[in-house]
From Swiss-Prot:
Keywords: Alkaloid metabolism, Methyltransferase, S-adenosyl-L-methionine, Transferase, Virulence. InterPro entries: COMT-like, O_MeTrfase_dom, SAM-dependent_MTases_sf, WH-like_DNA-bd_sf, WH_DNA-bd_sf. GO terms for molecular function: O-methyltransferase activity. It is an enzyme of class 2 (transferase). SUPFAM superfamilies: S-adenosyl-L-methionine-dependent methyltransferases, Winged helix' DNA-binding domain. This is 6-hydroxytryprostatin B O-methyltransferase. Its EC number is 2.1.1.293. Pfam families: Methyltransf_2. S-adenosyl-L-methionine binds at residue 270. It catalyses: 6-hydroxytryprostatin B + S-adenosyl-L-methionine = tryprostatin A + S-adenosyl-L-homocysteine + H(+). The active site is at 313 (proton acceptor).
Length: 411
């Protein structure tokens, strides 16, 4: 049971800390972007969120708190519906629009009264709003659909593609208690043919769905923007002269490293269609070259270091083993394997808010890929079982980063 006065005191103290950090950095308190905050500000922000949630639980009590969590399916389903109806896209950036006019702009017919019921519910959660005349206008949350294309793409992906697999978790466990069978995972079951026991993988589904494939890339852009800035500070790059960025997309991360460390020659490897786009970029860095490569085949490059950033959490243990072993074939004594991924803490270790985010990501990887986020113990076991020459060096988590850098040296 939470101590209510103690939680309230902690909340007040951390609000003061956060306000102080906001004043120092000049960031906006309601922008939702913590990247300008220092370690103290980030910690205070997490504590405020946690304390506020504890106060809600304390105020509701155990039973109502559980029911509130389950009832949030109504919130999610209603917001999901408004996004899929493309309602936020049809609301003007400024001003408002009457319901009768709004429904005429939608591709899917819906009665004005029903649409009004949906919006009058979601506005209580901060999604869309009404003006004094009862016409629809944007809230700060819904305004991302007209002001932030990448975040909007991520939201559309979640509404159309990311939420539904969660309802198949129980059925997936009945078919595959290990959670490792890619074609029996929650998403595979969602996308399977009627009556089938197996379904397609995430990437096979996206291959046939260009709309959600683009939304997925938009979502990754949001994810990358919030994390790329940590890469340059996550490792002592002065010790590296040649680097292979495996699965490095169009070289956004490689460019951050190359701009900060001009001595490094970087080879970015990815699928042919991605490398083709990368080679067409006008802002290519002179120290970066691009190469088509399937990371399930032997690594062709000899380098000082090999970098896997946000790759392994998309794959189950068997596939991760295949990926690391293909890199291992190219390792020479003194070469390093660098993995930047989320690292699950032990229960209660560190910030509870951070742990919640990481464990949500873990279950998200399971529902979409039959994959996982891993603890340090799990990551070390996976890598070191592939090649006994690899000796673990260290783990470093940059302040404010969702991911940690892990390094091994080949002896």
């Amino acid at each position: 049971m939470f101590n209510l006065p103690e939680v309230a005191t902690r909340l007040s103290q951390n609000v003061e800390l956060l306000v102080d950090e906001i004043d120092k950095t000049g960031s906006q308190p309601n922008c939702g972007n913590p990247t300008l905050l220092g370690p103290k500000g980030l910690a205070a922000r997490d504590e405020i969120i946690l304390a506020a949630e504890k106060l809600l639980q304390q105020g509701r009590g155990p039973g109502p708190s559980l029911l509130s969590l389950l009832e949030s399916a109504v919130d999610i389903g209603t917001i999901q519906t408004l996004i899929r109806l493309e309602v936020p896209d049809q609301v003007p950036p400024t001003g408002s629009i009457p319901y009768d006019a709004l429904v005429k702009k939608l591709k899917t017919p819906v009665a004005p009264e029903l649409l009004q019921r949906l919006i009058r519910f979601t506005r209580l959660a901060g999604f869309l709003d009404e003006d004094e005349e009862g016409a629809v206008k944007h809230s700060p949350m819904s305004a991302i659909f007209v002001s932030d294309p990448d975040s909007a793409g991520q939201a559309r992906f979640m509404a159309d593609f990311g939420i539904r697999p969660c309802s198949f978790i129980y059925e997936s466990i009945k078919l595959d208690p290990s959670g490792e069978a890619t074609r029996q995972g929650p998403l595979a079951l969602m996308a399977r043919e009627p009556g089938a026991r197996e379904g397609p993988t995430f990437f096979e589904v996206l291959e046939k769905d260009p709309v959600n494939r683009n939304r997925w890339h938009d979502g990754m852009a949001v994810h990358n923007d919030s994390m790329v800035r940590h890469v340059a500070d996550a490792y002592d790059w002065d010790t590296v002269k040649s680097l292979v960025d495996i699965g490095g997309s169009e070289g956004h991360v490689a460019a951050v490293i190359a701009n900060a460390f001009a001595h490094i020659q970087i080879t970015v490897q990815d699928r042919p269609e991605i490398i083709e786009k990368a080679r067409q970029r006008v802002d290519r860095h002179r120290n970066i070259t691009f190469e088509e490569h399937d990371f399930f085949t032997p690594q062709p490059r000899i380098a000082d270091a090999y970098f896997l950033r946000l790759i392994l959490h998309d794959w189950n243990d068997a596939d991760c083993t295949r990926i690391v072993r293909q890199i291992s074939s190219a390792l020479r004594p003194g070469a390093r394997l660098l993995i930047m991924d989320a690292v699950l803490p032990e229960p209660g270790e560190g910030s509870l808010q951070s742990e919640r985010q990481l464990r949500r990501s873990d279950i998200g990887m399971y529902t979409l890929f039959s994959a996982k986020e891993r603890s340090l113990v799990q990551m070390r076991r996976l890598v070191e079982d592939c090649d006994d020459r690899l000796r673990f060096e260290k783990l470093y988590t940059p302040p404010g980063s969702h991911a940690s850098m892990l390094s091994w040296i080949c002896e």
